[in-house]
Design a protein with these regions (language model features):
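Hydrophobic alpha-helical transmembrane segments in integral membrane proteins
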Residues: 345-369
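Asparagine-centered strand-capping/turn motif at beta-strand->loop junctions
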Residues: 385-389
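Intrinsically disordered, low-complexity Pro/Gly/Ser/Thr-rich segments with frequent PxxP/GP/PP motifs
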Residues: 405-432
């Protein structure tokens, strides 16, 4: 007699289910659109602004010059890029420790462009239910063909303009526009289409999948949270047990909590999660479920805040908002803020006070020390002088370190604006005036 065992197979992979976010109005949604406008005005507008006769912000990789408003940076100024990356990392740590994934929910490019593409989709195809009906309709439907075609045209237009603007930060945008109109540009045109394709794919189709599976921040955010971090939270003590009820029914008498189980918080979520199941790595902290729940609470006459930004310790101990905020600005956050402020001030001071001149000295390996007419000993050095200003400069070169040290030929050199020039310098001393061996030499270059 054999005993049969029931076996079941659990798949680690599940087919993707399209998320149809519902449009909602509220404070957090309005703030998201404020950030969309601010970030996109900066992104699309900055390449068109001029600083004198040049583009205000331009990363000219070919010429190895980086124009940031007034200053002109060179590869030798790599320390500023390093500092900028450190500032970004510290800012992310600070914002995450205070209020979770604020960056993800309000200013991340993936969120911003997904919001723009969803707004176009909503205007053309309709709200959530209309889009779901349209997707179920046959492709022979003239309405579906017309709306889908118009939506794709709008998406492609935004994506192409985004790609063009992005490349315009690396190639003068007016020159780039003229080249594209003539189908020239080679690699520039390739990168326009590449970035446009990435924008089109990520914001139009992949959407929440980028946040769930591709973005590493979703995975390591738990290491940056603690119990005093403000996150989107469902008040289960107040909301449970959930259930549908008449507006006239007293929920306490019916043994129900304040949650009416309308699922509106799920319908508006751009990643399609149910916040009532607790903190999940897919939550981007956008606050749309807060807007949705507050709208429902207003309609049924219940207090707002069933879903709200709160800390885990505050929810557990039923603290007031004031008590929670006092714990939010804890030593960890103040430490992040102090380091961030110190580093930002140090970078600004360094950038403002930096010398607009770069000098590299290289010993000429092709020429050895030799005795020249006049009984002098000569060594040859190559100096690269980089003019970091936007006006031509005359520089005077001098050297110190040995008695009787002279320069030949003329020690004055002209360097064009934002240009560099190699100068051959011959250093001469009277033969026998210095002991054999190496001696330190100091070059001085003055404008």
């Amino acid at each position: 007699m054999s005993e049969e065992k029931n076996q079941s197979t659990v798949s680690f992979y599940a087919p993707h289910k399209k998320v149809y976010p519902r449009a909602i109005d509220g404070m957090f949604n309005r703030w998201r659109w404020v950030m969309v406008w601010v970030t996109q005005l900066v992104f699309y507008g900055l390449p068109w602004l001029q600083w004198g006769e040049r583009q205000m912000v331009l990363f000219d990789l070919g010429a190895r010059r980086f124009y940031l408003f007034g200053p002109v940076l060179y590869p030798q100024d790599f320390i500023y890029l390093t500092g900028r990356l450190v500032l970004s990392a510290l800012s992310l740590c600070l914002f995450t420790a205070v209020a979770g994934r604020l960056w993800c929910g309000f200013t991340c490019p993936q969120t911003v462009y997904t919001e723009i593409f969803m707004w176009l989709e909503n205007r053309i195809e309709g709200d959530r239910s209309a889009r779901m009906r349209l997707d179920k309709a046959a492709w022979t439907s003239p309405e579906k063909l017309a709306k889908k075609g118009l939506k794709q045209l709008a998406w492609v237009s935004v994506a192409l303009w985004t790609g063009f603007t992005f490349v315009g930060f690396f190639v003068p945008i007016r020159t780039l526009g003229a080249e594209i109109l003539q189908w020239q540009g080679g690699w520039q045109l390739f990168w326009v289409f590449f970035y446009a394709f990435a924008t089109y794919g990520f914001a139009g189709f992949m959407r929440e999948q980028v946040c769930k599976y591709m973005c590493p921040y979703a995975r390591f955010q738990s290491a940056m949270f603690d119990e005093d971090t403000l996150i989107v939270t469902y008040d289960s003590a107040r909301g449970e047990p959930r259930g549908v009820r008449s507006k006239k029914v007293d929920p306490k008498a019916a043994g129900l909590g304040d949650c009416i189980d309308c699922s509106l918080c799920v319908q508006v979520c751009p990643t399609g999660i149910d916040i009532r199941n607790g903190l999940q790595y897919e939550c981007i902290g956008c606050g749309l479920c807060v807007d949705a729940c507050n709208t429902v609470m207003d309609k049924v006459g219940y207090p707002r805040g069933l879903i709200r930004f709160a800390t885990q310790s505050g929810m557990r101990q039923r603290w007031t908002n004031h008590q929670m905020l006092r714990r939010v600005f804890r030593p960890r956050v103040l430490g992040y803020g102090a380091v961030l402020l110190t580093l930002a001030v140090a970078m600004m001071v360094s950038l403002v006070t930096r010398t607009p001149l770069k000098v590299d000295v290289v010993r000429d390996r092709t020429a050895i020390a030799r005795i020249v007419p006049g009984g002098k000993l000569e060594n040859v050095y190559q100096l690269q002088i980089m003019n970091a200003t936007e006006t031509p400069q005359h520089y005077r070169i001098s050297a110190q370190g040995l008695e009787g040290l002279t320069l030949a030929p003329d020690s004055t050199v002209q360097v064009p604006a934002t240009g560099a020039r190699w100068v051959s310098v011959q250093l001469q001393i009277p033969y026998g005036s210095a002991a054999p061996g190496s001696h330190p030499i100091h070059f001085t270059v003055q404008a």
